[in-house]
Regions:
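Non-globular, low-confidence helical/coil segments that flank catalytic cores
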Residues: 2-295
Length: 295
């Protein structure tokens, strides 16, 4: 009887080991299937959430960063997209600023996905969506820290993530947006929230914002993406997130004219839906297409 019990115990232990092993590999493979020729990739998925913003980064070591959650109606959409990527937990949630098209969907996300911690812009706002977002974080006991200028986000030793802009009392919601520069070896990506020209001018003056990939601020609004800002960033690629039938005229024709004049390649959620970016720190692929960039 004891021998049988030991045998069953051994078989069960082996079963658990291989189940965990293959489960891990299935998840890892599912995240990198389209870029199997890249080892240790940094992946960014810019989600199509209509007239809003949401994106997720999967760092080379497997850590995950969710930036914004779209509006209220798209919270469930973000959850489905995360699950398709086999993401059931988020190591860091970045709430760039308190506008509803960025934080509205976070209530559903926090209810469905385990969030380890939140990085917030520090900009307070008197709105129902902002109140519910803060209340849910409190009820879920999710720690919130306020982003500080030049703060380093330490999640993967091979990827530098730096805060270049965050909330100030004198700033509007948009100009309080958290701006992140993500650098993986030779490749840099600038993620800009909804900043407008005032914040752009401060970044030009005080920060190194040069990057091969630029997430265009404020959905391509005329209030952002000045010529001086584009010269300072000097991107090869621009990512734009907006709804085709939005009521704001995004992206503004003046912004698109500047991008075209400077020869900056554009990827839009209107055209592509979700946009996939993958890099090993040397080569850059967007929508499975290699994009030649200068290091």
């Amino acid at each position: 009887m004891n021998k049988n019990r030991k045998r069953y115990s051994l078989i069960f232990s082996i079963f658990i080991f291989f189940t965990a092993f293959f489960s891990h590999n299935i998840n890892s493979e599912a995240r990198t299937t389209n870029y199997g020729y890249i080892t240790h990739p940094l992946l960014i998925y810019f989600f199509d959430v209509g007239q809003g913003d949401s994106m997720v980064m999967i760092l080379p070591n497997g850590k995950t960063v969710l930036i914004d959650g779209g509006d209220v109606e798209h919270g469930g959409v973000v959850i489905k997209k995360l699950r398709r990527l086999h993401i059931n937990a988020i190591d860091l949630l970045v709430s760039t600023h308190p506008d509803i098209d960025h934080i509205g969907g976070l209530l559903k996300v926090m209810n469905s996905v385990k969030i380890t911690k939140i990085l917030d812009s520090g900009k307070k706002y008197n709105s129902h969506s902002y109140y519910l977002y803060k209340k849910e974080a409190y009820q879920k006991s999710i720690p919130i820290s306020i982003a500080k200028l030049d703060e380093k986000i330490m999640l993967d030793p091979n990827v530098d993530i730096t805060v270049l802009n965050s909330g100030k009392k004198s700033y509007t919601n948009n100009n309080s947006s958290i701006v992140l520069k993500v650098k993986y070896a030779d490749i840099s990506i600038l993620l800009t929230g909804d900043i407008e020209r005032k914040a752009e001018q401060r970044l030009i003056k005080n920060e190194n914002i040069n990057a091969q990939v630029l997430k265009i601020p404020h959905h391509g609004s005329s209030t952002s993406t000045s010529e001086a800002f584009l010269f300072a960033v000097n991107p090869t690629v621009a990512i734009l997130s907006y709804d085709k039938f939005n009521l704001f005229g995004h992206p503004h024709r003046s912004v698109m004219k500047r991008l075209n004049h400077l020869g900056i390649k554009q990827f839009t959620t209107d055209q592509f839906g979700d946009i996939e970016l993958a890099t090993n720190g040397h080569k850059l692929y967007i929508e499975k297409e290699e994009v030649l960039v200068d290091p």
